[in-house]
A protein has these predicted regions:
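Domain-edge interaction signal
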Residues: 1-198
């Protein structure tokens, strides 16, 4: 089970709000955080914040991160302010990204560039149109790393024993080999073997 990195989660949220330069709705921020976690997993074969992920009726979210902004913790203590239009950086906050690596920042910036300027309604339309195929509308369930990986590649499937398999390559292509090891390296090998664009 991954360890939740609270400081990284706070700095990731701060980075996205800093890029926004204004308030972002709670739904939009939580979805952008999920997309960043997902992109980091697919690129680097490990979780960014370590938060568990859940499919909720309105969309996927990082449960540990959502708890930071739900009132169970004090967002103000971490430099965030609630407003009528969502969360923003507090005016007294000078964001620091000391806990974020260059890869972390690149992932956050990439997600912002792709989705940050979209409205909450536009993000919901993208979700309904398959932005995150591991999420199904109206379903509440845990989202595992394996489900994300399987959802992005038609070549990968899970057999009844929960082993990950790669279907045979199409005729005329080189045979792909799969080494399945637990942990991040297994996911890395699977992602490369399946030809997933990362």
């Amino acid at each position: 089970m991954p360890v939740f990195h609270r400081e990284k989660a706070i700095e990731l949220a701060a980075r996205l709000l800093w890029l926004a330069g204004t308030s972002v709705s709670a739904f939009s921020l939580l979805l952008l955080l999920y997309l960043a976690e997902r992109a980091f997993l697919l690129r680097h074969a490990e979780r960014f914040t370590g938060s568990s992920a859940e499919a909720l009726p309105d969309g996927p979210m990082l449960t540990d991160v959502a708890a930071l902004f739900s009132g169970e913790a004090s967002p103000a203590a971490d430099g965030f302010a609630r407003g009528p239009h969502g969360l923003r950086l507090a005016t007294t906050c000078k964001p620091s990204f000391d806990h974020l690596s260059a890869a972390d920042i690149e992932t956050a910036d990439s997600i912002w560039a792709q989705f940050g300027k979209l409205s909450e309604a536009e993000l919901k339309v993208l979700l309904q149109n398959g932005l995150c195929p591991e999420w199904q509308s109206g379903v509440t369930a845990t989202i595992t790393d394996t489900q994300i990986l399987v959802a992005v590649s038609s070549d990968i499937r899970i057999d009844p024993q929960n082993d990950i398999k790669i279907d045979p390559p199409p005729k005329g292509t080189k045979e792909r080999h799969l080494t399945c090891r637990p942990g991040k390296f297994g996911f890395c090998v699977i992602a490369v073997a399946a030809g997933i664009s990362l």
